[in-house]
Design a protein with these regions (language model features):
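Acidic, low-complexity intrinsically disordered segments
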Residues: 1-146
Length: 146
């Protein structure tokens, strides 16, 4: 029987590098894991206001730099749902699993129009060594364009 997960310690968080930006500036939103053990994938949707922010691109975060892990990720916005960014991040099985804490992805947005955009996860899961969903606290954020 597997050991029970330490549920409260695992957290998936959205953390913008700044909470307020001017129109035309880029804001980077870190997707961070805290207290991860044997994580193999992190699929999620990120909801945002497309009138305030425009998705620009996604890159691996500093928590993955200097590790032997081989991340594979896809990120795209469906033109029919402009405020819905679908992201899939997984690690090549032979390269190991993610353990620890830190920003695993950085998602860049262009500040388009004045206003406030909630940034929240939808259908987010953190998956363990056998692709089982792990119990995790999921925390969103906001961004303001002035």
């Amino acid at each position: 029987m597997p050991e029970p997960q330490d549920a409260p310690s695992l957290r998936l968080t959205l953390a913008p590098d700044r909470h307020a930006v001017s129109r035309g500036e880029t804001i980077s939103v870190a997707v961070a894991l805290t207290g991860a053990r044997d994580v193999t994938s992190v699929p999620f949707h990120l909801q945002f206001d497309p009138g305030v922010l425009q998705y620009v691109g996604t890159r691996t975060g500093p928590a993955l730099n200097g590790r032997s892990l081989q991340p594979i990720f896809l990120a795209s916005v469906n033109p029919d749902r402009p405020g819905d960014l679908a992201v899939g991040l997984s690690f090549v099985r032979s390269s190991g699993t993610f353990n620890g804490s830190g920003a695993i992805l950085l998602i860049d947005f262009l500040a388009l129009g004045r206003g406030r955009s909630d940034l929240h996860f939808d259908r987010a899961t953190v998956r363990g060594a056998t692709s089982e969903p792990l119990t995790a606290e999921v925390v969103g954020s906001t961004a303001e364009v002035r």
